[in-house]
């Protein structure tokens, strides 16, 4: 399977089911009353870690993820069925980002985070029944689910990280001690992505990450250095494999110092990790001499002479690896405070003039109110108008200089403002599309009188 450590996904939670508008109509029951049920809740979207996964490749092929919608409410106060939640599985070590801010750092198996909340079901007319309104003709549309664009970044979690210059034999060592089968060839940069393997030694199991070859200048981004070095941040122990022949014009003894410098420059914490040095390719004639030089110069590190190809000395270095891993705690990677999203109290609404002359009203709650309103239901429109008045939206629009005839955009709806400031410092309500003002009792009596006059004339 190919390795992928960055991916962009689009997530949409499920929409809530619509509420039902119905009345109980049965023989011998004169005042049955409202019996419209509520809609079901839309499905939430979670991101959860799974140990068996090692790449984000599958999400790259399926970046659009959408949960199911809740079902509509029914008559006889039947509540619609809520949709099942949707879970996106990712490898351990995945960082979830939104707008450049970290919203979750999933390092342990089974960790999960809610990234998109499903919409609540719209209320049926039974829910609007009150002492003063015993037969409400109003119901709600289901609340839309949250939509969000996320960036996932994987930082490999491993007990042992294999580091070194290209062609030092890291992939050969991994294939020797585990069942992993990375690509192995006699040219540098054979490994372009981290490879993971699980090794077992003396009844101790540990995860090994084969990090692609690091070159001089990697800490400054040379040779995709940043992409490779970030995967070392969460390893517990480092095994530095050295080629006796060196790399290019850098000899084997000097190469140890170069890698140490690159680790320290990229992140000082990397240089503090326990590190074991293994001179690979022990079958080469000059290997023994180079080994003695490294032991003499780097006395603070344990140095081993091995051959990953033949297995010579591998057991000895595995003994040391198990010993060091057992004594080293799992790294606790702290997230920088400057990158953590800090959310304050969101205002109820925000008014923003648009370039085309329209006025946009933003606000999660107020947009949901509009999107959940049936504009073909008179009582629903009146309820929304009263809400606009109570939350102070009308006065705020007047203060912003909104004039009669201006278009107000809220959520997915557009309204034509017909209000003017009155002596009582109140304005008329927005003129809703398709809305007809409720007639007064005097107007209804006048219409009846007009109909009687027409009949008498005939």
UniProtKB/Swiss-Prot annotation:
Chief subcellular location: cytoplasm
Sorted UniProt keywords: Cytoplasm, GTP-binding, Hydrolase, Magnesium, Metal-binding, Nucleotide-binding
A cellular component annotation (GO) from this entry: cytoplasm
Enzyme class: hydrolase
Bias type Basic and acidic residues, positions: 423-446
Binding site for GTP: 164-171, 189-193, 210-213, 280-283, 307-309
InterPro entries recorded: G_OBG, GTP-bd, GTP-bd_Obg/CgtA, GTP-bd_prot_GTP1/OBG_C_sf, GTP1-OBG_CS, GTP1_OBG_dom, GTP1_OBG_dom_sf, OBG_GTPase
GO MF entries: GTP binding; GTPase activity; magnesium ion binding
Top-level taxon of the source organism: Bacteria
Cofactor: Mg(2+)
Compartment(s) where it occurs, according to its Swiss-Prot or TrEMBL record: Cytoplasm
Domain OCT: 341-419
UniProt-listed CDD domains: Obg
Region of interest called Disordered, as start-end residue ranges on this chain: 420-458
Domain Obg: 1-157
Comp. bias (Basic residues): 447-458
Self-association and partners: Monomer.
Primary role: An essential GTPase which binds GTP, GDP and possibly (p)ppGpp with moderate affinity, with high nucleotide exchange rates and a fairly low GTP hydrolysis rate. Plays a role in control of the cell cycle, stress response, ribosome biogenesis and in those bacteria that undergo differentiation, in morphogenesis control.
Protein name: GTPase Obg
Organism of provenance: Elusimicrobium minutum (strain Pei191)
């Amino acid at each position: 399977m190919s390795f992928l450590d960055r991916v962009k996904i689009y997530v949409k939670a499920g929409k809530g089911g619509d509420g039902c508008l119905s009345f109980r109509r049965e023989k011998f029951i004169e005042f049955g009353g409202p019996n419209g049920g509520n809609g079901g809740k839309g499905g939430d979207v979670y991101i959860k870690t799974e140990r068996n996964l090692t790449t984000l490749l599958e999400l790259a092929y399926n970046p659009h993820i959408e949960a199911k919608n809740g079902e509509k409410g029914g008559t006889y106060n039947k509540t619609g069925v809520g949709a099942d939640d949707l879970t996106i599985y990712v490898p351990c070590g995945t960082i979830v980002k939104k707008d450049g801010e970290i919203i979750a750092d999933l390092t342990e198996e089974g960790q999960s985070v809610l990234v998109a909340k499903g919409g609540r079901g719209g209320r049926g007319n039974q829910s609007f029944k009150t002492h003063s309104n015993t037969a409400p003709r109003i119901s709600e549309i289901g609340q839309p689910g949250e939509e969000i664009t996320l960036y996932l970044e994987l930082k490999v979690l491993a007990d042992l990280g294999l580091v070194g210059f290209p062609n030092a034999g890291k992939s050969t060592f991994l294939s020797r001690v585990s069942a992993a089968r990375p690509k192995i060839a006699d040219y540098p940069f054979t490994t372009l992505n981290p490879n993971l393997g699980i090794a077992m030694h003396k009844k101790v199991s540990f995860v090994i990450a084969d990090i692609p070859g690091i070159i001089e200048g990697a800490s400054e981004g040379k040779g995709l250095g940043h992409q490779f070095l970030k995967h070392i941040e969460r390893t517990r122990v480092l095994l530095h494999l050295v080629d006796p022949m060196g790399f290019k014009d850098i000899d084997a003894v000097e190469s140890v110092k170069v890698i140490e410098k690159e680790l320290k420059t990229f992140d000082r914490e990397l240089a503090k990790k326990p590190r074991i040095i293994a001179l690979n390719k022990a079958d080469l004639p000059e290997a023994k001499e180079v080994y003695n030089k490294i032991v003499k110069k780097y006395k603070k590190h344990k140095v081993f002479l091995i051959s990953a190809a033949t297995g010579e000395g591998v057991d000895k270095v595995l003994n040391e690896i198990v010993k060091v891993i057992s004594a080293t705690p799992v790294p606790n990677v702290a997230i920088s405070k400057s990158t953590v999203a800090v959310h304050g109290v969101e205002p109820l609404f925000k008014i923003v003039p648009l370039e085309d002359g329209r006025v946009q009203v933003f606000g999660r709650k107020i947009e949901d109110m509009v999107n959940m309103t049936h504009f073909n239901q008179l009582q629903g429109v009146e309820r929304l108008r009263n809400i606009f008045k109570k939350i102070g939206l009308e006065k705020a629009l007047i203060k912003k200089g909104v004039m009669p005839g201006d278009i107000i955009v809220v959520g997915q709806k557009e309204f034509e403002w017909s209000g003017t400031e009155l002596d009582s410092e109140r304005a008329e309500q927005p003129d809703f599309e398709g809305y007809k003002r409720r007639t007064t009792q005097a107007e209804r009596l006048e219409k009846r009188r007009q109909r009687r006059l027409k009949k008498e004339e005939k």
